[in-house]
Amino acid sequence: MSTKSYSERAAAHRSPVAAKLLNLMEEKKSNLCASLDVRKTAELLRLVEVLGPYICLLKTHVDILEDFSFENTIVPLKQLAEKHKFLIFEDRKFADIGNTVKLQYTSGVYRIAEWSDITNAHGVTGAGIVAGLKQGAEEVTKEPRGLLMLAELSSKGSLAHGEYTRGTVEIAKSDKDFVIGFIAQNDMGGREEGYDWLIMTPGVGLDDKGDALGQQYRTVDEVVAGGSDIIIVGRGLFAKGRDPVVEGERYRKAGWDAYLKRVGRSA
């Protein structure tokens, strides 16, 4: 795992998206990504306004929104991202051949490449998925974009481990600029070959151990000590009975303290 500070890594990173994110993390003292799966745009924007000061990254699933529109959802979302200084990660999990994912990324109702700083993909279809998504981004925007590969998942019974994970890492090596890291539960290495991948870890909780649908939670200290750079937290921030302000600061501090411990810095 990396023991360098976020700012040190930002200064040397090949990806402008990764460098921007790492600098935001250092500036805001946050490695918290909020995962907000809600059905209404108004609820999404309300939660983003409240949680914005505590996060470095917002993870969305815009296809869950029942009232999505570019003008009423994406425009205000981008304004909030600028106001609160966080990036946006649309958790699309692309998993098709290169030409198809290129169209899915750039076209249709959501036009993800136009507004999402980061997206992600499965490695099951091979390296063509990376090339297709990169080409799509270059065709529709001058803004830098980044891709995460899904190397490991937090759900019970996931098939993303072992040989599959190793194969996904090899696919990530096909593009040093566009692929910025992984969705993973552990460090994915690569530093000795010149890669500085960001590791983002879902299934992080300070209280619950899991849910009835197979999600398994690990502690903040556990995942950061194991190599995670960004903790992804969803219902722990805004579920019924939880105050997003209290939980946002609680998880931000827990994640930051764990990072300081890993790199040998004091608060």
From Swiss-Prot:
Annotated keywords: Decarboxylase, Lyase, Pyrimidine biosynthesis
EC number: 4.1.1.23
Active site: 93 (proton donor)
GO biological process terms on file: 'de novo' pyrimidine nucleobase biosynthetic process; 'de novo' UMP biosynthetic process
Species per Swiss-Prot/TrEMBL record: Kluyveromyces marxianus (Yeast)
Catalytic reaction list: orotidine 5'-phosphate + H(+) = UMP + CO2
The protein's name: Orotidine 5'-phosphate decarboxylase
Family label: Belongs to the OMP decarboxylase family.
GO CC annotation, single: cytosol
